[in-house]
Amino acid sequence: MNQQDKEWKEEQSRIDEVLKELEKKERFLETSAGGLKHDIIGLRKSFWEDVKVNFDDAHEAIETMASIKQQAELLSDREHNHRRMDQQLKRIHQLKKSPYFGRIDFIENGEEQAERIYIGLASCLDEKEEHFLIYDWRAPISSLYYNYSPGKAEYEVPGETIEGEMVLKRQFMIKNGTLKAMFNTDMTIGDEMLQEVLSHHSDTQMKNIVSTIQKEQNQIIRNEKSKILIVQGAAGSGKTSAALQRVAYLLYRHRGVIDAGQIVLFSPNFLFNSYVSSVLPELGEENMEQATFQEYIEHRLGRKFKCESPFDQLEYCLTETKGGDFPTRLAGITWKAGLSFQQFINEYVTRLSSEGMIFKNIIFRGQKLITKEQIQSYFYSLDQNHSIPNRMEQTAKWLLSELNKLEKKERRKDWVVHEAELLDKEDYLDVYKKLQERKRFSESTFNDYQREQQLLAAIIVKKAFKPLKQAVRLLAFLDVTQLYLQLFSGWGGKFQHEKMDAIGELTRSAFTDNKLLYEDAAPFLYMQDLIEGRKKNTKIKHLFIDEAQDYSPFQMAYMRSIFPAASMTVLGDINQSIYAHTINGDQRMDACFEDEPAEYVRLKRTYRSTRQIVEFTKAMLQDGADIEPFNRSGEMPLVVKTEGHESLCQKLAQEIGRLKKKGHETIAVICKTAHQCIQAHAHMSEYTDVRLIHKENQPFQKGVCVIPVYLAKGIEFDAVLVYDASEEHYHTEHDRRLLYTACTRAMHMLAVFYTGEASPFVTAVPPHLYQIAE
């Protein structure tokens, strides 16, 4: 037996020993969990039997409440323990398939013998709970595996740096408890393991792969010193994976201090949320809060306006370029996206401190109780040294006081008498009870008609005034819409736009139709918050923004203002800047962080696609030279010329059939717009089964789909077929980024179809990087 065979046998023997220990723990947990489940069912059934209920007097009531509380706490404790055991069992089931993926032998300075450290998805102690059989990949010592080759190495623990020497680094592939591959490596993560992982087919859920975390990704995951971490990464470089693993690391590292509810991920769309939803549970953690910026807008303004989505805005910009309002709309989108527009609003709100506030009349039953001029007069009578939000609060208090006075006067009006006549018996009984409580008269004097009518009037008017008072408390007397529109009448100072009048007219037209354009949403909310003084969210400790290039500088600055206490991890790729504000605008992700210390990380190496696909796609970019493909070989990309849409759909169907035979499970026909998707789907359905995805709330499923490029962002497919990459559809710089984004969704196969003349971004690719099919 040679040395390699001997080591293989030793490692398999250790795997077997670890599996035995895992099975012991599994049996113990299953028995304990079963007993707990039985207890929980029993407690639920007998809950009220074990509680002594007596509300006869105050003392008995207190005892009853204490008994209920005690029983509820007992049940809650049992349920919590059962959930914890269930999570532990799930973790053990995962570990049984593949207990660990790496081993390092590390000699700490001052020690003589190396410690063997096996690294896996979760930690596992021996039977006596004294020694680690497996270290969690997030443990401080595990960072050695990701950061170092054999030689001098160190890792951080709280308050100390542990130095020493790594004398061995070994990687494993273990499937269902059997050692399939083992190799020592001088690299951070060996190419053999990456090749194995990356050769798999795409799925409807993002894979959790902690065994192949690269050194540069590990620096993102474990970074705790940077308040703001900005990651610029090429398509397929592992940005999103690193972000989700960073969430898992933070939850592990700060267990008991931070929970999943204090971490928010802003992601591009619902489809993406569905795609990444399984990663954290697979890592043994609860999912963090996930939202899209559009969901936040709808939450704040959806009852007031029909809110345009970023997809509708982009669809407009891609399909309505010949419309008369298009140049004005595009100029408005670009202006409202920038930080200069934020300064424009800041100057405007400063001016509102002394003039220009617009209020609404307070109307009751068609009559003006308090006019907007009266409210404005009171507001500006207050000390101007006080902030606008402070004066708004004082104005609301004054209005409530005035309404209380008016409410008393209203009781004598004729409509109140009429309303009293319409009251049913229950209302009269309620009045009788209230009168008794006040001891104004007894049963023998209940015929005191005058007092009865007074109380009835008070109740009727109070009920009628309640919505008014509630609206005042919510500051609804402020006319935020007119204040925002007034902004375009030259009130914003030096940061005006040369087309401001036309932009203002277009904005007014949208508001007249009760429509909030996407480019107006963040500025509108920002201005409203400055005036009303909305409370900041200090509960959120970490904010993750994926596909950050999709957000305008204004939107990024606004999100920063919403979560001022949060650390931020911002991830994106400027080459995938496809949304409307980037057509003629700023594409930087860091524009709003210039006043805060931020750390920048660049991920150049891309792992998603084969080397052939990466070489093809990077050639489409002007600055793609520094993108590094991982050396995974595959088919050459295919460029297919077709004669018209009928031929295009036929050839697409043929290619889909070929790809299915090769075993590809997720195939995307990617179009430029949703409108094009609908047309393509109608034509292609005659030749093959294909699913149309053109709304963001549709789930991602296996099979063949037709999807617009902006909904495919952040997702990967086994094969991508680009629908009609002709010069007609892809010729501007913005189109270049759209086409690049579409092509970089492919893992194993890329085919680009076109009619007429090919896009200049396709013809710019050197011919030796693709194959041509007629």
UniProtKB/Swiss-Prot annotation:
Domain UvrD-like helicase ATP-binding: 212-610
EC number(s) given by UniProt: 3.6.4.12
Subcellular location(s) of the protein: Cytoplasm
Subunit structure: Interacts with the RNA polymerase core.
Protein name, as recorded: DNA helicase IV
InterPro entries to which the protein is assigned, alphabetical: DNA_helicase_UvrD/REP, HelD_bacillota, P-loop_NTPase, UvrD-like_ATP-bd, UvrD-like_helicase_C
Similarity comment text for this entry: Belongs to the helicase family. UvrD subfamily.
Catalytic activity: ATP + H2O = ADP + phosphate + H(+)
Record key words, sorted: ATP-binding, Coiled coil, Cytoplasm, DNA-binding, Helicase, Hydrolase, Nucleotide-binding
Coiled coil: 3-31
Gene encoding the protein: helD
Function text: Catalyzes the unwinding of duplex DNA in the 3' to 5' direction; this reaction is dependent on the hydrolysis of ATP.
Annotated residues for binding of ATP: 34-39, 233-240
Main location: cytoplasm
GO MF assignments: 3'-5' DNA helicase activity; ATP binding; ATP hydrolysis activity; DNA binding
Domain of life: Bacteria
GO cellular component entries: cytosol
